[in-house]
């Protein structure tokens, strides 16, 4: 939805001249966003709007174990199915104001009604709540990057709201470059985090241990990549690489 639709209606850039000169959108490009990963497990997340975009946002929240409530008089058939199976709670009605946000951690407005979107944003802002109005950067205090996700590996791509289409293109390109070998390496390294904390007494020693493996020769990513489909030969080679690093660092600690 274009930013012009919000002119004179509490637009965050405070332009009430009958038109919006896009200053509010430009301001998003200059905003130094703080990038973080949110743990949504057990947290109430609200989506207002039950169309295709609402479905996309609901599925993203469900993928992160959010407790999702949908408010919409009508909903996409897939959302209806989610409600019937108990995956989400669907309140089949219009947005009712600030009371709908009670106990909510995050709200996403995905309607085609300008007034509803403005109301959701204003109500959430007054409660210092995370709020995103889809495709209207001025009415967001957080934005949703495109995500490349493989196993425990997640890569976020953001254009600060300037071009979601560009972010999606970058996502496709990154998916081809960083895939299963990187995700598998993350799992293998996680397996020895406990050993590292129990054996290597300082942060610097643990840092050198892990960085030595990740940036070492032979390259563990290339070992995993070359061993894909070869009865786990790549993974076995990386396990041996890690074991060698463990022995070397444990020896250094014993001599200290």
Regions found by a protein language model. Name each.
Residues 86, 101-106:
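Short acidic/histidine-rich motifs immediately flanking catalytic phosphotransfer sites
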Residues 68, 90, 130-131:
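Hydrophobic beta-strand scaffold residues
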């Amino acid at each position: 939805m274009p930013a012009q639709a919000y002119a004179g209606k509490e637009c965050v850039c405070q332009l009430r001249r009958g038109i919006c000169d896009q200053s509010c959108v430009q301001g998003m490009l200059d905003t130094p966003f703080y990038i973080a990963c949110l743990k949504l497990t057990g947290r109430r997340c609200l989506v207002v709007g039950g169309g295709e975009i609402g479905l996309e946002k609901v599925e993203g929240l469900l993928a992160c174990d959010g407790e999702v409530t949908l408010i919409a008089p009508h909903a996409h058939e897939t959302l209806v199915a989610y409600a019937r199976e108990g995956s989400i709670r669907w309140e089949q009605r219009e947005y009712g104001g600030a009371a709908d946000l009670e106990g909510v951690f995050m709200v996403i407005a995905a309607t085609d009604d300008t007034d509803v979107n403005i109301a959701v944003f204003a109500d959430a802002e007054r409660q210092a709540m995370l709020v995103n109005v889809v495709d209207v950067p001025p009415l967001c205090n957080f934005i949703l990057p495109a995500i490349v996700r493989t196993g425990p590996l997640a890569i976020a791509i953001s254009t600060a709201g300037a071009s979601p289409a560009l972010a999606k293109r970058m996502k496709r390109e990154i998916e081809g470059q960083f895939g299963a070998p990187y995700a598998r390496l993350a799992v293998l390294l996680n397996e020895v985090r406990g050993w590292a904390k129990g054996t290597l007494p300082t942060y610097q020693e643990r840092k050198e241990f892990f960085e030595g493996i990740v940036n070492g020769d032979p390259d563990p990513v290339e070992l995993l990549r070359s061993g894909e489909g070869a009865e786990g030969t790549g993974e076995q080679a990386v396990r041996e690489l890690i074991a060698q690093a463990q022995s070397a660092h444990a020896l250094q600690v014993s001599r200290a």
